[in-house]
């Protein structure tokens, strides 16, 4: 037990993790770009045990297709005071076969802005992990462990 009498971190089952993935609408795609990590927020859906999102030509497409990626989703429930996160690691592939494209186009997955997102990416999971924990009460959460430092110039 943690100092506050609650379990510090609960490891979620795969089923619980997928349940949270189905509830969220925005996740973060983590990729390597020019030997540097980068993160892209994307709206997505869970479909057939995988993550599906739409994108356009560009860095996100070039840095994800055919590569191992990480995909993270998190949330906070103010009524219970619990936060959670789920991470999927797997290979991203572009959906190209006609029957898969037609199925994906039937999903209620639409771009959030006017730029066309004609490419459909599917992340096939190799690992799924999730955690849930109780957030500290406000005074403890806002107490700095050390004095803040100025940002580098």
Residue ranges and their predicted role:
Residues 22-24, 37-39, 66, 116-118:
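Short gly/pro-enriched beta-turn/loop segments at secondary-structure junctions
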Residues 24-56:
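Short beta-strand segments
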Residues 57-120, 125-127:
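Short, structured beta-strand-loop surface elements
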Residues 108-153:
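Short, active-site-adjacent segments that bind or coordinate small-molecule cofactors and metal centers
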């Amino acid at each position: 037990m943690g100092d506050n009498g609650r379990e510090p971190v609960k490891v979620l089952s795969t089923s619980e993790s997928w349940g949270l993935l189905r509830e969220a609408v925005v996740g973060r795609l983590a990729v390597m770009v020019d030997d540097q990590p980068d993160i892209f927020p994307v709206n997505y859906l869970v479909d057939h045990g995988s993550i599906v999102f739409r994108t356009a030509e560009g860095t996100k497409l070039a840095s994800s297709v055919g590569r191992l990626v990480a995909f993270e989703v998190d949330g906070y429930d103010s009524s219970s005071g619990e936060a959670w996160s789920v991470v999927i690691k797997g290979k991203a592939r572009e959906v190209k076969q006609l029957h898969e494209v037609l199925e994906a186009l039937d999903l209620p997955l639409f771009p959030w802005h006017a730029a066309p997102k004609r490419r459909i990416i599917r992340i096939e999971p190799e690992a799924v992990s999730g955690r849930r924990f109780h957030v500290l009460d406000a005074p403890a959460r806002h107490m700095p462990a050390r004095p803040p430092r100025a940002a580098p110039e």
